[in-house]
Design a protein with these regions (language model features):
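Alpha/beta enzyme core
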Residues: 2-269
Length: 269
């Protein structure tokens, strides 16, 4: 039987839909002891690279404001800007679950603003969930988590401590994160990003909490690991001069660009 172009396109779309992971698939991975691989990215090309590598979760982080846009203050980064990057990643992600962060400025604007933003992220980016960062402000911002849940859009709260501080591992730290991980889980969160705690705390929380618990500093004791693409690959200008053996995509690009510039200047290209 010969299929028409339209029929072939429909079959490809159907096959892609069957292969697409869901939030429930991530939960099943935890239940079976399989680890969740997550990557933070903001653009089409990095999304395609991660997908080819087999990533399970793509997170469009509000860190794009600093990494790509050169902003020094999160208050400069708007929801409209976040939606632009969220659309780019969701448009080409065919397998991974996609998260789009709630911008910090929106989180600080109150539950009503968060509710409206969640609706826009869901409808305009077609992402699977949104991450609400309530680190160090769990008491003040917990209602933001409830606001997203009230819209019916899955929420993925970030709990814990700032990454520039030493790792937190005291009994007090454990009690703090355990309290709030239980709170967001009981409220209906589908996943938790636990930030900057000791491996012992990651282990204890991941074992006690039913939903997946992953983080950017976690080891195999958690349910998975998040890597920021541009740190992982060294796609940062400050990695050009490093000689510590870590990956440096920037150095590779720099050498190619430098050679091209030299040839143009000398008229030998």
């Amino acid at each position: 039987m010969k299929w028409s172009a339209l029929e072939c396109a429909s079959i490809r779309a159907w096959e892609e839909e069957l292969s697409r992971l869901t939030i429930n698939d991530l939960q099943l991975m935890k239940n079976k002891g399989e680890k969740i691989a997550a990557g933070v990215c903001y653009d089409v090309q990095m999304t395609k690279i991660w997908e080819r590598a087999g990533v399970d979760l793509l997170s469009v982080g509000d860190s794009v404001s600093r990494t790509f846009l050169g902003m020094e203050d999160d208050s400069e980064f708007s929801l409209d800007a976040m939606l632009l990057f969220g659309k780019a990643v969701a448009r080409v992600a065919h397998r991974a679950v996609v998260n789009v962060d709630m911008p910090t400025v929106t989180c600080n604007a109150g539950p009503k603003a968060v509710e409206e933003a969640a609706k826009r992220i869901k409808s305009e980016t077609l992402a699977d969930m949104t991450k609400v960062d309530i680190r160090t402000q769990e008491e003040e911002l917990f209602d933001d988590v409830l606001a997203v849940i009230g819209t019916g859009f899955p929420v993925y709260p970030q709990i814990g401590f700032d990454v520039w501080e030493p790792s937190h591992g005291s009994t007090k730290d454990f009690d703090h994160v355990m309290k709030w991980c239980n709170a967001v889980q009981d409220a209906g969160a589908v996943m938790i990003d636990l930030t900057n705690v000791s491996h012992e705390i990651y282990s204890a929380v991941a074992n006690a909490i039913k939903v997946p618990v992953i983080g950017g500093q976690s080891g195999p004791e958690a349910d998975g690991r998040i890597y920021v693409s541009y740190l992982l690959t060294g796609y940062r200008s400050d990695s050009i001069d490093k000689n510590d053996g870590t990956p440096s995509a920037a150095k590779y690009i720099y050498e190619i660009a430098s050679d091209a510039v030299s040839k143009i200047h000398s008229g030998t290209w």
